[in-house]
């Protein structure tokens, strides 16, 4: 068992390492104790929820109950009567619509390299079951939950599509105007001459479809953040993997200078890529402003993380290999279809990166590879 005495003894031993010129320590070949290890082992580490003041308002999100359509009206009358409810905000309360991207990518001044800005903090144009259409701010969790159940929503429903191959067909429901056949992006790799290579006599054809399912990351700590007005800035504390990008995106979402946003990232209880996307920080900050800058906490329940945060994309791949009897590859072909869900998020980067590795898997002089990232009415 690692005791406090042993912990500090290890640190002292590390300090005895010989120093290079200029006073720099030599760590190569030495035992180095993680600076965060002891606090985590004894349970002293503080996570996002531990740091939030008890006087915070609680926010809960109302998600859509249809896969594709438009919100016609939202009746909040009964919800607002519930004791403890501070405010009910809907997609119709957005005075200005600032679309923003969510991917954990660096920002580019070249518009062609920028991530797709297709999200709003709350939307009246629903694209998947679980889209964010309203939010409740209350003094406690019980009041917030009761208010959610009291809200009445009227929709105009549209046809939906859940399969990537169906989504690419002519006449399929279109999720976004600027992406015909719901194709977010299509990229190709060409090496050698596939069509000529497969004419070689005696080749063995190996062909099949291979699919990976969508996977939820299931980190122990659900997504959580809280926001409050701090002088002329908005302070947001979030269990994110990308604090600097969250700062920029929150500025874009609120239509304010990035310098007026302060992000604090405590220890996080797992992320595994789910928190490498901007999730509900912009919404939490916007809700904070709706109640005069008062502290607002948004803790997403486990059930909602499966539907309304992020998943690893399902990818369906068709692979054809032409092989000589001695086992050497002559030509290989791949078509990969990534089910992006309703919004761009990290966009084509996931599928493109996977397909980019295809020519490197086996020695082969003739390769064709196509990557398609496709919108469907499903979770992102």
Outline where the language-model segments fall.
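Alpha-helical support elements that line or immediately flank enzyme active sites
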Residues: 61-92, 134-154, 225-292, 349-359
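Helix-loop-helix junctions that connect adjacent transmembrane helices in secondary transporters/permeases
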Residues: 171-254
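Short Pro/Gly-enriched beta-strand edge/turn motifs at strand-loop
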Residues: 105-108, 200-215, 298-306, 346
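Gly/Pro-rich active-site capping loops and adjacent beta-alpha segments
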Residues: 30, 143-163, 244-246, 304-380
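Flexible, low-hydrophobicity surface segments
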Residues: 11, 20-180
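Glycine-rich and small/hydrophobic secondary-structure elements
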Residues: 108-143, 272-325
């Amino acid at each position: 068992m690692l005791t406090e005495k042993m912990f500090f003894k290890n640190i002292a031993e590390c300090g005895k390492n010989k120093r290079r010129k200029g006073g720099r320590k030599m760590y190569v070949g030495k035992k180095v104790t993680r600076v965060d290890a002891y606090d985590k082992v004894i349970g002293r580490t503080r996570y996002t929820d531990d740091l939030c003041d008890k006087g915070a308002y609680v926010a809960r999100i109302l998600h859509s109950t249809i896969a594709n359509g438009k919100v016609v009206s939202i009746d909040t009358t009964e919800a607002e009567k519930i004791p403890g409810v501070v405010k009910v905000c809907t997609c119709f309360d957005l005075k200005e619509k600032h679309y923003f991207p969510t991917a954990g990518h660096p920002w580019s001044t070249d518009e062609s390299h920028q991530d797709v800005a297709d999200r709003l903090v709350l939307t009246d144009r629903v694209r998947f079951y679980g889209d964010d259409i309203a939010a409740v701010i209350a003094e406690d969790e019980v009041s917030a939950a009761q208010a959610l159940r009291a809200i009445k929503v009227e929709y105009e429903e549209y046809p939906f599509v859940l399969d990537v191959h169906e989504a690419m067909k002519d006449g399929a429901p279109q999720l976004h105007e600027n992406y015909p056949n719901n194709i977010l992006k299509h990229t190709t790799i060409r090496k050698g001459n596939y069509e000529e290579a497969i004419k070689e006599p005696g080749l063995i054809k190996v062909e099949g479809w291979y699919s990976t399912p969508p996977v939820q990351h299931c980190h122990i700590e659900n997504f959580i953040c809280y926001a409050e007005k701090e002088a002329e800035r908005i302070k947001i504390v979030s269990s994110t993997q990308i604090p600097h990008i969250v700062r920029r995106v929150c500025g874009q979402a609120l239509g304010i200078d990035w310098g007026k946003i302060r992000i604090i990232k405590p220890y996080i209880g797992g992320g595994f890529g789910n928190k490498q996307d901007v999730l509900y920080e912009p919404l939490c900050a916007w809700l904070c402003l709706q109640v005069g800058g008062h502290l607002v906490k948004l803790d997403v329940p486990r059930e909602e993380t499966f539907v309304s945060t992020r998943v690893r994309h399902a990818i369906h791949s068709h692979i054809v290999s032409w092989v000589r009897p001695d086992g050497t590859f002559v030509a290989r072909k791949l078509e990969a279809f990534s089910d992006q869900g309703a919004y761009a998020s990290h966009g084509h980067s996931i599928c493109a990166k996977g397909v980019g590795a295809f020519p490197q898997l086996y020695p082969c002089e003739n390769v064709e590879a196509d990557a398609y990232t496709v919108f469907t009415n499903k979770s992102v």
